[in-house]
């Protein structure tokens, strides 16, 4: 039997291929960044051909580093940045335009139009989602309205819509020569075009948004054999797992029981709680979404708090303000001061997501005095991540009725121990970092491995999970609530900036 499982992890800033063994340990990894394209304020694009090229490159590099071939892999899974929207020509394989990235806000006029006609939550009961620039359905509508020839091709079935999972799968399984046009339930649930209860494309939503059914992919489980990869160097390997990145991290953290939750700290931050086989409708500004579907089992659902900007704020301080040269330098800089000097940063670069859902909010730095230094800004940036996570945790506790016993964490920012301690302090709950922090890729590997019998069951996966470090809260309650009150005040200042 093949010794390993592979995972394609196609994220907002880079593409990676990671090879895992049966214990969930990394055998080999390769990574390559792609360009972020900003044609106008609020617009964010990726080049689909660059993403495809980089994905193929990192697959080859990771295999070469460990001296592996396709025959060493039992299966491959895909995890991807969600909501990022593509439309490509079925006959040529060429994209009709650049991909509209999840944080792109060009659909704000469409959102306002639909909100005026029936309120921000008019489709929430069916889709689990509020009207927002975040979701893929209206991004597709924008492409159909604004890219020459797109609408006619989509209606004729000559243009194919997909999120990044669909784009990669179609290309890897043959492309113009019979590639499989599929998406899994988790990615489909981020389009605003499916009925959560049935996990099927919904005619009412398609009609409301003006989306032709002919361009849509087939919806499949998150763990199932979709076909064989037909491109080198993975030719002949089964493609057998597919999950949006945050759902993949939930699986990678083995949150298989209702009430289990994880928070991923990446470009944005995403807190997901497994709610079992029934969707829980949020009254506190969270999203109701698919968690995963393993083979023929019933789909599992989750509540999600999506935060647009956390790690991206650190990048902004590095790239735009030049406060430091590389991201890890933010921690010693922030540690050089005792507190934030009463400075608060609300990073509403793309509006505010959960639990506020304010597309008209924009970034604010509040509380500045002559006392404030670059170190205070660095500290305020890290703290803003923790405050945003608390906003979401409070909403999640309100919706679920379950108090968070501990927060399982993953993602790039968990290496920042100042942030992890402050997170525990501001939540007044333990924060737990697992030994394996690459849980997004691991979740995709788990989904693929389960589909082909590489792992027998969920207990095999649970046995792989272990704690690296736990941070206990140590901040006095009075201090914690004083800080949080100031944060809430700063958040209010960010609202209603865009007319």
Curated annotation (Swiss-Prot):
PROSITE patterns named among the record's database cross-references: FGGY_KINASES_2
Residues annotated for sn-glycerol 3-phosphate binding in this entry: 12, 82-83, 134, 245
Residues where ADP binds: 12, 16, 267, 311, 412, 416
Catalytic activity: glycerol + ATP = sn-glycerol 3-phosphate + ADP + H(+)
Documented EC number(s): 2.7.1.30
Any single GO CC term annotated in Swiss-Prot or TrEMBL for this entry: cytosol
UniProt: ATP binding residues: 12-14, 267, 311, 315, 412
Gene Ontology process terms (BP): glycerol catabolic process; glycerol metabolic process; glycerol-3-phosphate metabolic process
Activity regulation details: Inhibited by fructose 1,6-bisphosphate (FBP).
Top-rank lineage group of the source organism: Bacteria
Pathway membership, UniProt: Polyol metabolism; glycerol degradation via glycerol kinase pathway; sn-glycerol 3-phosphate from glycerol: step 1/1
Enzyme class: transferase
Keywords: ATP-binding, Glycerol metabolism, Kinase, Nucleotide-binding, Transferase
SUPFAM superfamilies the record matches: Actin-like ATPase domain
Positions with a binding annotation for glycerol: 82-83, 134, 245-246
GO molecular function: ATP binding; glycerol kinase activity
Pfam families linked: FGGY_C (PF02782), FGGY_N (PF00370)
Family membership noted in the UniProt record: Belongs to the FGGY kinase family.
Protein function: Key enzyme in the regulation of glycerol uptake and metabolism. Catalyzes the phosphorylation of glycerol to yield sn-glycerol 3-phosphate.
Protein's UniProt name: Glycerol kinase
Biological source species: Acidiphilium cryptum (strain JF-5)
Gene it is expressed from: glpK
């Amino acid at each position: 039997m093949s010794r390993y499982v592979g995972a394609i992890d196609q994220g907002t800033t880079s593409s990676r291929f990671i090879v895992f063994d049966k214990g969930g340990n990394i055998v080999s990894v390769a990574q390559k960044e792609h360009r972020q394209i900003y044609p106008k304020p609020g617009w964010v694009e990726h080049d689909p051909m660059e993403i495809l090229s980089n994905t193929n490159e990192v697959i080859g590099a990771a295999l070469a580093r460990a001296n592996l071939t396709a025959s060493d892999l039992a299966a491959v899974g895909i995890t991807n940045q969600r909501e990022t929207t593509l439309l490509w020509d079925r006959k040529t394989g060429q994209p009709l335009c650049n991909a509209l990235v999840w944080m792109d806000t060009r659909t704000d006029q469409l959102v306002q139009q639909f909100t005026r006609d029936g309120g921000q939550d008019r489709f929430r009961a069916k889709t689990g989602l509020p009207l927002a620039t975040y979701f893929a359905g209206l991004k597709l509508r924008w492409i159909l309205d604004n890219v020459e020839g797109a609408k006619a091709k989509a209606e004729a079935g000559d243009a194919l819509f997909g999120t990044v999972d669909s784009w990669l799968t179609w290309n890897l399984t043959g492309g113009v020569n019979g590639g499989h046009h599929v998406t899994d339930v988790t990615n489909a649930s981020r389009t605003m075009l499916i009925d959560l209860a049935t996990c099927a494309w919904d005619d009412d939503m398609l009609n409301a948004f003006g989306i032709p059914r002919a361009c849509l992919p087939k919806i499949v489980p998150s763990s199932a054999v979709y076909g064989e990869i037909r491109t080198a160097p993975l030719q002949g390997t089964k493609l057998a797992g597919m999950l949006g990145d945050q759902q993949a991290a939930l699986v990678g953290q083995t949150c298989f029981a209702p009430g289990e939750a994880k928070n991923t700290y990446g470009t944005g931050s995403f807190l997901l709680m497994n709610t079992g086989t029934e969707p829980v409708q949020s009254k506190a500004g969270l999203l109701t979404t698919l968690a995963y579907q393993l083979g023929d089992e019933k789909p599992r659902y989750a509540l999600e708090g999506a935060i647009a900007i956390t790690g991206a704020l650190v990048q902004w301080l590095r790239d735009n303000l030049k406060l430091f040269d590389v991201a890890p330098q933010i921690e010693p800089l922030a540690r050089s001061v005792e507190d934030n000097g009463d400075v608060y940063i609300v990073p509403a670069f793309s509006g505010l997501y959960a639990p506020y859902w304010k597309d008209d909010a924009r970034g604010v730095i509040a509380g500045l005095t002559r006392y404030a230094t670059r170190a205070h800004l660095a500290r305020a940036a890290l703290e803003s991540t923790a405050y945003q996570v608390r906003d979401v945790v409070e909403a999640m506790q309100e919706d679920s009725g379950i108090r968070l016993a501990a927060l399982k964490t993953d993602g790039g920012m968990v290496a920042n121990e100042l942030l992890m301690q402050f997170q525990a302090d501001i939540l007044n709950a333990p924060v737990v970092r697992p030994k394996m922090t690459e849980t997004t890729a691991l979740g995709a590997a788990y989904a693929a491995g389960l589909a082909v019998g590489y792992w027998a069951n969920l207990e095999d996966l649970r046995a792989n999970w272990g704690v690296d470090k736990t941070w206990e809260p140590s901040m006095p309650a009075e201090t914690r609530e004083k800080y949080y009150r100031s944060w809430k005040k700063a958040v209010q200042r960010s609202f209603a900036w865009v007319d």
